Amino acid sequence: SFLDTGSAGAITLPGFRRYVIDPARTTVRALVHICTAGLVTNLGELRDPRYLDVEGTVRAIEANRDIALGVKIRYSDVIVGEGDQARAALLAALEAAERSGTWLMVHIGRTPEPIADVLQLLRPGDVVTHSYTPLAGGVIDDRSLRVSPAAIEARAAGVQFDIGHGKSSFGWATAEAALAAGFAPDFISSDLHRGCVNGPAFDLPSVMTKFWMLGMPIEEIVMRCTSIPARKMGLDAGTLRVGSPADIAVLSIDEEPVSFVDCTGEHRVCDRRLSASYTYCSGVRLDPDILGVTEDLPVEISSRPMGSGS
């Protein structure tokens, strides 16, 4: 199962549904971007406030309740600007989530206002993603490596924290400090795109391996990748219970040293790694040719060299 976090906005969701979600052999759900056009690389989709679309976002969710689970905003200064303009975008995203009866996911890192001010606006069930970003404005201070007291308070109030390991959203030192302080993520996830599939994220088993190396028990890692996010998505998945859909990922443990890089360029050597062997969806084995994978975007990313990253 996949959760797409904001590729499409109100005006692009119909096309995203028709050409991506509906034909998919896997289960795909989506968050609707508060920018009406959706996520636009790093051009700053909300630097022009005319692209904020509360009404359209609410309508899009209501028309697609079976696949649209909530609202997404990328809350970085390069995306939303600064000051009142940035705050207006966050408030618009919150309004759309409130009016549609859904939850909001907030992307952080280079956050345009103090993280405490952001967290105090969030409601129980809202999600912060890129929680272990080494960038400024994260829930782990980029200088002191201390967990923000506001993050601890927000968690106690029901806000959830996601990893979303992509190109610039995971630091070894940040993750190590967070786990040592008892601030484990609610969800362990990848944020895969062309900027990170060849490093530093590679794939979800590689992200899982990083947490294994940091000392998290494998049972907890698996739960944070399967049953816990499945509940968040309202799916009868993430379980091997009799009668449940046979959605199964078969992982292998490769007992060989491998160097993993984080988003700051720091390398650490893991003495073993997880890699994907097989994936089944509703009992049907999914092979790369079924997914339409091209040579420049291989499925078995974890089998590639892992010594460098962007």
PLM regions: where:
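Active-site core of metal-dependent hydrolases
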Residues: 77-198
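Residue-level recognition of short, solvent-exposed, well-ordered loop/turn junctions
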Residues: 123, 241-244, 281
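Short acidic, glycine/serine/threonine-rich loops at helix termini
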Residues: 14-15, 40-45, 83-85, 116-119, ...
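Core-facing hydrophobic residues within beta-strands of well-ordered domains
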Residues: 68-71, 125, 185, 276
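His/Asp/Glu-enriched, well-ordered alpha-helical/loop segment
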Residues: 173-255
